[in-house]
Amino acid sequence: MYFVAGKLGLRLAFVHPSASAVWPPSGIALAALLIFGYRAWPGILLGAFLVNLTTAGSLATSIGIAIGNTLESLVGAHLVNEFAGGRQAFQRARDTFKFTFLAGMVSTTVAATLGVTSLSLGGFAPWTQYGSIWATWWLGDAVGIVMVTPLVILWSSRNHERWTLIRAVEAAVLAVCLLLVSHLVFVGSILAPKHYPLEYLCIPFLVWAAYRFSPREAATAILLLAAVAVLGTMHGSGPFVRPTPNESLLLLQSFLGIVTVMTLAFAAALSERRRAEERAYYLAITDSLTGLANYRRLIEELEAEIRRSARSGKPFALLLLDLDELKKINDARGHLVGSRALCRLADVLRAHCRDIDTPGRYGGDEFAIILPEASATAASQVASRIYEQLARDGEQPVLSVSIGVAEYPHDGETVEALLRAANRVLCEMKRRLHREVT
C-alpha cells in the first residue's frame, strides 16, 4: 500500500521528482505504527526505499530518503503515543490538536530535512532550491499525516455505531451533496475555470458530517473533498490554480490541511460531548454500588410499563425484594461485607432476568424487578429460582430474601398501588418467617 500510494503521489511531483505536495504514504506509515506497533518499521523502510529507487536518485540517496521517512514515522508515533493519546487521538479535540502539532508539524521536519539533504549531497537537487523543495516535502508529508492517518485509524477501529436505514440514507445524501458541491467548486462547472474563491461552499457539508456523524465519517468526507479538489486543480480549475502546478498544489494542500484539522477537532469535540451526556445519563439512572437501575429509573420503567400494558391489554408483574438481616451483617462483619452482600444479590437478580426485565435497587436493602408480559405465577417462579440460587451460594454470610409479588392490573393500576400491593405481600412473608423462627 505504501509503495502504490508513493508512486501515485510522485506523479504530482513538480518541484523535484522526489518531492510531492501530495504524499499519502506519510499518513499510511504513521497509521501502521500506531496500529501494529513499532515492529512495522521495516515495511516502511522497504516501501520508502523502493519508491525512491524506482523514481529518481541513486542507491545512496534512496537509502537516505527511506531512513528519513522511517524516522519521521517513528518519531511521530512516539510523540503521539506519549502525548496525544495514541490511537485514541481523534476522540478528543485536545488530542487532535496535539496530534496535528506533534505528528503533522514536528515529526515531518525529519523526513523533509534528511530527504532534501540526501538529494542535495548526492547532486540530484541544487542547493539553491533547497528551501522550495523542503517546503513542498514538508507540507506534503504534513497534510498526508493529518488527512490519511485519522482515516486509517478510525476505520480500523471495531467500535463502530450500527447505522439504521435512515442513518445510511442521510450519509448517502451527504456524500452526494459534498461531491456535487466539490465538483461545482473545483472541476466541471462554468465557475471552476474562473477561479472564484468558492471553496467555503464545501465547509457546511464537512460540518454536517462532523455534527451528525462521528470523526470517522468526518475524515471520510474530507477524503472525498480532497480527491475532487486535487483532480480539479490539476486540470486547471478551481480557486487555487496558479501559474505553476506546484504552487497550485501547495495552496490547495494548505487549505485542505486547515479544513481537516478544524473538521476533525469539531467532530472530536462533539463526540466528547455525546460520551459525556451518555455517561451523565447512565449515572443518573444507575445505582452506583450494584450497577442495577436506581429508584428513579425503576419508577420511570414502571410508569412506562403501565402505559404499554394499558395499550396492549397484557399483564405484567412486579417483584419487591428485601435482603434479610442486612443490619446484622453490617454490625457483625462490617459495612464492606454488607455492601458485598448487596452486590451478591444484585448478581443473582441479573442472572434470573430476561433482557426485557428491569432489575433495580429500590432503596437501602430493597430491590425490585419489573417483569413485562408476565403473570403473578410466572413472577413467583422467578422468585423461587432466586431463593434456590441464594441457598446454593457458598459464599459467607449466607443470604436470604423476602419477596412480594404484584400483578398489573389485578393488584393495582398505578405505580403507588402496585408498590403497596407488593410491599403487603413482602411484609406478610417477613411476619410469617419471624413467627416460624420464634
Residues covered by each model-derived region:
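Alpha-helical scaffold within the catalytic cores of cyclic-nucleotide enzymes
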Residues: 345-350, 378-396, 423
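Conserved nucleotide-binding and Mg2+-coordinating catalytic segments in signaling enzymes
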Residues: 281-300, 321-334, 343
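Catalytic/regulatory signature loops of cyclic-dinucleotide turnover enzymes
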Residues: 391-399, 418-438
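Conserved metal-coordinating catalytic motifs of nucleotidyl cyclase and c-di-GMP turnover enzymes
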Residues: 141, 287-290, 319-322, 364, ...
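Signal-transducing coiled-coil linker helices
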Residues: 200-201, 245, 250-288, 296-307, ...
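A short pre-motif secondary-structure segment
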Residues: 358-361, 397
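Hydrophobic transmembrane alpha-helices
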Residues: 1-49, 53, 78, 85-99, ...
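Active-site-proximal alpha-helical element of nucleotidyl cyclase-like catalytic domains
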Residues: 301, 337-358, 366
